[in-house]
Amino acid sequence: MPRPALRSRSKKRKLVRTPGGRLALHVIDKKHDYPKCAICGRPIQGVPKLTSRLERRGVRMPTRPYGGYLCHECLRKGIKLSVWMSASKQE
């Protein structure tokens, strides 16, 4: 029986043939994909592929507004649109 930490179904299982000829079950973590932009779906630059739990604090997310949620181009378009809308409301 595997230990409780390895019973989670969120981990992948892989059958490995041992030198003795028997099959053993290895439990491995799933690979993570790059975070994607919420608008265009492109990978966000400056964000690592690991989970934030595994990374140190200085590497986790960009410090710009919406960092780790929007890519730089969508953020630029959104800021320009909000400035344009606020300017048109004042007129």
Swiss-Prot record:
Pfam families: Ribosomal_L34e (PF01199). Gene3D superfamilies: 6.20.340.10, 6.20.370.70. GO terms for molecular function: structural constituent of ribosome. GO terms for cellular component: ribonucleoprotein complex; ribosome. PROSITE patterns: RIBOSOMAL_L34E. GO terms for biological process: translation. Keywords: Ribonucleoprotein, Ribosomal protein. Belongs to the eukaryotic ribosomal protein eL34 family. This is Large ribosomal subunit protein eL34. It comes from Thermofilum pendens (strain DSM 2475 / Hrk 5). The gene is rpl34e.
